[in-house]
Amino acid sequence: MSGHSRNSEQEDTLSEELDEDELLANLSPEELKELQSEMEVMAPDPHLPVGMIQKDQTDKAPTGNFNHKSLVDYMYLQKASRRMLEDERVPVSFVQSEKNTQNQREVGDKGIKNMPQFLKEKLNSEILAKKRESNGSNNVQEAEDDDEDEEEEEEDDEDEEEEEEDEEDDEGEEDEDGEQANREKNDAKEQIHNNPGTYQQLATKTAHEQKDTSETKEKGEKKIAKLDPKKLALDTSFLKVSARPSGNQTDLDGSLRRVRQNDPDMKELNLNNIENIPKEMLLDFVNAMKKNKHIKTFSLANVGADESVAFALANMLRENRSVTTLNIESNFITGKGIVAIMRCLQFNETLTELRFHNQRHMLGHHAEMEISRLLKANTTLLKMGYHFELPGPRMVVTNLLTRNQDKRRQKRQEEQQQQQLKEQRKLIAMLENGLGLPPGMWERLGGPMPDPRMQEFFQPASGRPLDAQEVPFGSRKEMIKNPPQPPQCKTDPDSFRVVKLKRIQRKSRMPEAREAQEKTNLKDVIKTLKPVPRNRPPPLVEITPRDQLLNDIRHSNVAYLKPVQLPKELE
């Protein structure tokens, strides 16, 4: 009982001596925060989950939500970049410096107390190395004088004396450092005795310092045993080749100069796959193409063109009248740029092929619908390099392109017919001139006649004199009635009168021409007409008794109806 009473009395005295409120009041705000964090670590709240017990130890405020995937990707990129830098870095420590690394390891093992011995060994090794070099030089240079050897020995002695003095100074400094360290240790012990709560903080600090020193030692121990020339060589694989990645040898400045000068020998401008071409130069090329009249093909595939270049191309197509093929595939043009280009195609009648597939961004459904709508105003585009996602615009654009191809084919056929008629009339003129026939005699003798629909094409101009071949058939009759006075007509006029009478009995060709025109008009009308839909037969349906009854009721008469007694239930 006496021992228990003594312990209780000691506890009361200790509690009276250590007042917690006074201690907490004397602490600074920083010390209070540290004490709170230590208490949370020592005695965490059991009601909190494990993830909430360990708080963040960073002062920086969070910039966003935690994303594990992005963190892993960032760590992977850091590791890859560090590895690449280590492979590309030229080594600093070579094989010849193994002695220094061994000495550093020995110093790390011995500690701070053996520093003077290590310095002495290092100085002695340097002195021996210098002596060996001097001996080697003496052996190679035998013709040197003894005076020079004596001077070298004196210099070596002086160096040794200076090194010894340096060692003494270092020892004195180390002694002073040791005394300061002892003083700091004593002060720390006194602080720990007065404030037992700070003991744990000091322990953690010393642990961190030991870890840092071990890491620095490990970094110092790293070395490269052998030199690998492949690793020492500069690796240019990570560098982006800025000249011509795909082998396009186009001279940009020269090509731009030729485009501006409107060179007639330049029919194609190919800038494909020149990835590092400046945007300003691209705009210069497009603006120079506005007034060019000779380039037929303009290619800008995979050059990094964006919407500004697309708008410039739209303005170029509005003014240019020579480009037939435009290729802008594999760029960064969005739906707005493509729609602007398609909107300006209604003012262009020479472009036949447009390619804008494989863009960085999707055009979108609205842009595809707008493209199909704007293409209706263009009648010359024959090919389009793009795959539509929606089936509606795809079918509309396909039908419009087939329409343009049909118009192109019809125009080509008309040109061929005109060319054939020209050749036919030239042949008739050559025959009449070669045989000495009067004008119109070839037709009277049953020669081939041109198509009457093309008479307007061969009518003479108002200010030009009329030739014999260009005179219409009605005027030819008048010429035959009142022929000019050539020598042949004067010698034998009766023969022409006979031929004239014979020709009068035959049918004139004017109504034939009219009939042909009427036929052509009928053909055009027939083309515009639509076929009459056939009356489809009614579907075959089996007649039921109910249908028969209803049919009989419809076609029956009241006079033929028989009276029927009501059933008993209805009565």
Swiss-Prot record:
Gene Ontology annotations of biological process type? actin nucleation; pointed-end actin filament capping; positive regulation of skeletal muscle fiber development; skeletal muscle fiber development; skeletal muscle thin filament assembly; striated muscle contraction
> A single Gene Ontology molecular function, please?
tropomyosin binding
**Post-translational modifications:** Ubiquitinated, leading to its degradation. Interaction with KLHL40 negatively regulates ubiquitination and degradation.
Q: According to the UniProt entry, which residue ranges have a biased composition of type Basic and acidic residues?
A: 119-134, 180-192, 206-228
**Which InterPro entries does this one have?**
LRR_dom_sf, TMOD
Broad class of where this protein is predominantly found: cytoplasm
Q: Keywords on this record?
A: Actin-binding, Coiled coil, Cytoplasm, Cytoskeleton, Ubl conjugation
Query: Which chain positions lie within coiled-coil regions?
Result: 397-436
What positions does the domain WH2 occupy? 545-564
Residue stretches of biased makeup (Polar residues):
94-105, 193-204
- Induction behaviour: Expression is regulated by SRF and MEF2.
Recorded GO cellular component terms are: A band; M band; striated muscle thin filament
| Compartmental location | Cytoplasm; Cytoplasm, Myofibril, Sarcomere, A band; Cytoplasm, Myofibril, Sarcomere, M line; Cytoplasm, Cytoskeleton
Q: Which domain of life is it from?
A: Eukaryota
Instruction: Quote the tissue specificity entry.
Output: Skeletal muscle and heart-specific (at protein level).
Give the family from UniProt: Belongs to the tropomodulin family.
Question: What protein name is recorded for this chain?
Answer: Leiomodin-3
Which organism is this protein's natural source? Mus musculus (Mouse)
The major lineage groups are: Eukaryota, Metazoa, Chordata, Craniata, Vertebrata
